[in-house]
Amino acid sequence: YLTGSLKSKPDLSFETSPSPKLKNILESGLPTESSPFIKKLLKKFPPSELYGKSVKDKRGGKNNIHSWDIELKGAVTEEEKQLLNILLKERRKKKWASEIGIDWMDGMPLTKAQISTFYKHPDLQNILDSLTDKGYLVLEHPKQKIGGQRIKDESLPKGYNIVSGKKSFEINKILDPNDVAPTLVAMDMEHLFVVDNGGLRTLTGKEGLRLFGYPDDYSFDIPKKDRCDLLGNTVAVPVIKAVSERLLHTL
């Protein structure tokens, strides 16, 4: 937050206090959501193992679930999973940008020859074809940075890249009730889920308000999408109150 005062500098040093856990503001026993995606997710992982997990194909990490982990786009063999997990990291290495002849970007398509340097398999082409047919990989030209945009360079050979992007899946993250809530932004609010009743659901309006320090009797009866947009752009009431009280002392 930016603050200002005309004559004296306000004291904005605050004592730290124990962070409240997400479970302190969650409701329970509410209806959960059902979709092919959620069914596949719960088939592979019990709810208790989903706490704090993100669902993305752009990065790795122990707290990340990939689409191939739940076979979202079709069944995959152990060899196909292994290739996807290795390619996920390799395609971000800066050496490939130099070899391809492009500026580095977070995820570059690699040719079969390049892939074969770190994943040696006699049936590599069939594995690549299978993953491309299922939609886990895409065969595309590398991109050049032109005028601040990434434009496909058709003069360069096509390579295999993992299909990914922002908001690729209906769930971005399953919040951990035993941890603090992450930063909430308008773009992601609809894609944050919690475990409840043995299933998964999005945050309720009351829970969203509680996260920002609003009282339970605050009126907020608006459509879900509008609610998520507003909450994702709001401020934490207790923080504003504390800062405002300090500023008042300078008047």
Predicted regions and their residues:
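Flexible, glycine-/basic-rich loop-and-beta segments that form/coincide
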Residues: 1-74, 78-88
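C-terminal target-recognition/interaction regions appended to catalytic cores
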Residues: 63-251
